[in-house]
Regions:
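Helical hairpin unit composed of two closely spaced alpha helices linked by a short loop
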Residues: 331, 341-363, 367-368, 372
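Short alpha-helical functional segments enriched in proximate histidine and acidic residues
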Residues: 338
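Active-site donor-binding acidic/aromatic loop of nucleotide-activated sugar
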Residues: 393-397
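Catalytic-core elements of nucleic-acid end-processing and repair enzymes
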Residues: 404
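N-terminal localization/anchoring segments of enzymes in phospholipid and broader phosphate metabolism
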Residues: 1-322, 326, 330, 354, ...
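Histidine/acidic-residue-rich catalytic or RNA/ligand-binding cores of hydrolases
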Residues: 346-349, 376-378, 408, 426
């Protein structure tokens, strides 16, 4: 009996030590209070499950070696791609451009040609045309690359250019491509394409890499032509039910996107020895000197001011979050926002409420049925706060809304890979183009207004009458959302 008591006491002491040490680690990471308390509760109330969850998903990328510490200095932007004279920037928007520059070093560039691509077919056609025109290099970076008909089309294009002696590089996110068979990438590597996976996740190194993903969608051709936006490379993006936007750019902004690619590539080369290109350095992207090939699609804007932002979890302050808050708090007439996933950080949530209550027409469009159970209900949990503040909320009904756009006052807009959620604002590597151009902003506004025709506007009176079960699902989903 005495031995049994000692054994029980020893187990309790060990349990207390483990709990105390785990809580201490979480506290020392200095997260937002809500996240800290959420993890503490999980670790205390669910000791085994909580430890496993924290081990896989909760560790801070800025601690230890989540990304090789020697590569962190690479994530400093290069201002040489910014060539816009101050007098060309709207005086009212200069504080925004300065804010973004101070957050990440990204400057405004002039002389950019822009084409808005409003569906997957238009994007794939423009991308195929661009890759086929390559003479020096093709840098392709994506979150999802499926081994389906679209993936095979892209593979054939890349292999054909590699056979011509063009420097072809593919950087894909390992988690985003979990469902893509390895033989697909081996085929590309055998054909001369330099292939690399961003933060590969394989046991036993799963622990610190699941939660910080490279969500960028970039393609750069010869430093003169580039693409950025929300579309990955898979058949479902060609479906009429999939609604998304992408941007084709020519000019200095294309070279800036090339610099982002080379930064990520060097990071992978230094930390990922599984890559087929681990020992092959990539040349630094230079501002373009030659004119890009013409686009068969109509070019919407020919001389736009563009500022490329590339927030990452290594940033001291998120350029995307800072820019979004500034846009909301400085809007005069309206801010329209589209995002497939809506779980805003406290600064963004507060800015949306403040803008709406100040008389600005703030509108939020999200899919009626996001592609995830918890994503759906956690997003819904913010609708009541939006409606109470005067934000107009729209649920996109036909298919899935995947666009990530912001437009304000017909004077600026943003298009890219970043969602308005915790992951994009804090955890992921993203890329967006902030466009200081009235014609392009007006075009994005018209897209939003056209999409409104396919939406159900949520009215506060009806929303307040939703079933109790829905409210419980929303509240519980929101409780766990800060964990990740």
């Amino acid at each position: 009996m005495l031995l049994e008591n000692y054994a029980v006491a020893g187990i309790l002491v060990l349990y207390a030590i483990l709990i105390l040490s785990s809580v201490t680690v979480v506290v020392l990471e200095n997260r937002q209070p809500a996240k800290t308390m959420a993890w503490i509760l999980v670790l205390i109330l669910l000791p085994v499950v909580g430890w496993v969850a924290y081990y896989f998903f909760g560790q801070n990328i800025r601690k230890g070696h989540r990304i090789n510490k020697h590569t962190e200095p690479l994530y400093l932007h290069d201002a040489r791609f910014g060539n816009a004279p101050e007098q060309r920037i709207d005086r009212a928007l200069m504080p925004l451009s300065q804010l973004v520059y101070n957050c990440g070093g990204s400057a405004v560039s002039a002389g950019n040609g822009l084409t808005l691509l409003g569906n997957g077919r238009a994007f794939l056609d423009a991308l195929s045309e661009a890759i086929a025109s390559a003479r020096s290099y093709v840098y392709l970076q994506t979150y999802i690359l499926a081994a389906d008909a679209v993936g095979e089309t892209v593979a054939d294009l890349l292999l054909a250019k590699a056979a011509e002696g063009v420097d072809v590089r593919l950087l894909y996110d390992d988690v985003g491509c979990w469902n893509t068979r390895d033989s697909y990438f081996r085929r590309l590597a055998r054909g001369g394409v330099k292939v690399a996976a961003f933060l590969p996740v394989r046991f036993p190194t799963l622990t610190d890499k699941v939660n910080y993903r490279n969500h960028r969608k970039i393609c750069v051709v010869d430093g003169t032509l580039a693409f950025v936006g929300g579309m990955n490379l898979a058949e479902r993006y060609l479906s009429p039910s999939w609604h998304d936007l992408h941007l084709r750019l020519t000019g200095p902004a294309a070279a800036a996107l090339g610099h982002i690619f080379t930064t990520d590539w060097e990071s992978v080369v230094k930390s990922n020895r599984r890559s087929s290109a681990a020992s092959t350095p990539v040349p630094a992207a230079e501002p373009p000197t030659a004119a890009p090939p013409p686009c068969t699609a109509e070019v919407t804007v020919r001389d736009a001011l563009v500022q490329i932002i590339s927030p990452s979890p290594l940033s001291v302050m998120s350029e995307m979050e800072c820019a979004l808050v500034w846009i909301l708090l400085n809007a005069r007439r309206y801010v329209y926002m589209q995002t497939p996933y809506f779980m805003p950080t406290e600064p963004v949530l507060g800015a949306m409420q403040t803008a709406a209550m100040s008389g600005v027409d703030v509108r939020l469009m999200i899919p009626e049925k996001p592609d995830g159970f918890w994503l759906r209900w956690s997003g819904y949990s913010y609708v009541t706060e939006m409606l109470r503040a005067g934000v107009r909320v729209y649920f996109f009904r036909p298919g899935f809304l995947h666009s990530k756009t912001i437009v304000s006052d017909d004077r600026l807009c943003s298009i890219g890979s970043g969602n308005i959620d915790f992951r994009s604002l804090e955890n992921n590597f993203e890329t967006n183009a902030i466009i200081y151009d009235r014609p392009m902003a007006a075009a994005v506004r018209r897209v939003f207004e056209a999409d409104m025709e396919h939406c159900r506007e949520i009215l506060r009176e009806a929303w307040d009458r939703r079933p109790l079960l829905h409210r419980l699902l929303e509240s519980n989903a929101r409780i766990v959302s800060p964990l990740f």
